[in-house]
Amino acid sequence: MDKTMRGYRQIPVWLKYLINAVLLCALLVLGNHIVTSGAVNRAQKAVILQIGIYILLAVSLNVATGYLGQLPLGHAGFMAVGAYAAALLWKTLPKTTWAVILGLLLGGLVAAAFGVIIGVPALRLKGDYLAIITLGFGEIIRVLIINLPGITGGTPGLMSIPKHSTFLTVYITVILSCALIHTLMKSRHGRAILAIRENEIAAEASGVNTTFYKVLAFSVSAFFAGVAGALYAGYTGILTPSNFTFMTSINILVMVVLGGLGSMAGSIIAAGILTALPLMLQSFSKYRMVIYAVLLIVTMIFKPSGLLGRYDFSLSRILEKLINGRLFTRKAGKAGEDHA
């Protein structure tokens, strides 16, 4: 029975990755068919795309907040930088797949550069001081957008942005981004980042370059926020400073805290729920924000560590339980027949 129970674990690693890839591709094809076949209305389609964008924003902030243990409040600033960088590039390029990829990469790289510039001095501080500095950064970016109308369009906004953010573009980007972050956190670099979260002094005493890894985590967080910003630009087709206020950063932080600090799966679930909830409550238009707030308060009272805490699940774990459970049932049944 021991050999049977090992079922899924005996499958080669490359085959596990292949199974996961096939399942994800099937989900992408199914989702794209639902969106493009008219099975959902325009509002529902918009929410589906927003969910993907906010998943990436929540997962990216989780790198700095959940894995590193810091409290940045300027995530909307990195999102804005990436959004405007990609939008300006897309307005000058023809509509091609390479243009989309270049825009996403440019948005991420520009945001990561700002992450390094802000991270080097800011990450010497902790707690409230870091929150204040990053909050100031987000507001500076918003003010610059307003006061550079020749580049950003100013208060009226940057318009006529090509709408590149289709269902497949958004969710392929989200899946690849989550896979890259997951791979990073399973590497020795990820373990160093987690060590800093648990005890920075002990990590430094163990030989971990805390300054380097704090800036690394911060810049990775900023990079994927910039990519999400680029997706947002390609989704809306217009960017205004009001899209990137302090409340945007707070909303993203709420998703991370609600899902569970340090849980990628929690961030994904919370982002999906909080993005879809306003649409689900539209029948209660007068009270939907009150209901939204009450649900958040009740959840945090009864689940203060978030929906999943620090627990993460994966396709591999789910498949392992399903396969092992099925094999165990068959083995037990066969043993019963033999005994009879």
For each predicted feature, which ranges?
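Membrane-interfacial amphipathic/re-entrant helices at transmembrane-helix boundaries
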Residues: 1-56, 85, 96-103, 339-340
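Cytosolic-side transmembrane-helix boundaries in multi-pass membrane proteins
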Residues: 1-29, 198-200, 205-215, 281-340
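Residue-level recognition of pore/gate-forming positions within transmembrane alpha-helices
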Residues: 54, 83-84, 111, 135-140, ...
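Transmembrane alpha-helical segments in multi-pass inner-membrane proteins
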Residues: 76, 215-302
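Alpha-helical transmembrane segments within multi-pass membrane transporters and channels
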Residues: 93-139, 269-271
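Transmembrane helix-bundle core of multi-pass membrane transporters
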Residues: 132-189, 324-332, 339
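Helix-loop-helix "hairpin" substructures at the membrane interface of multi-pass membrane proteins
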Residues: 166-240
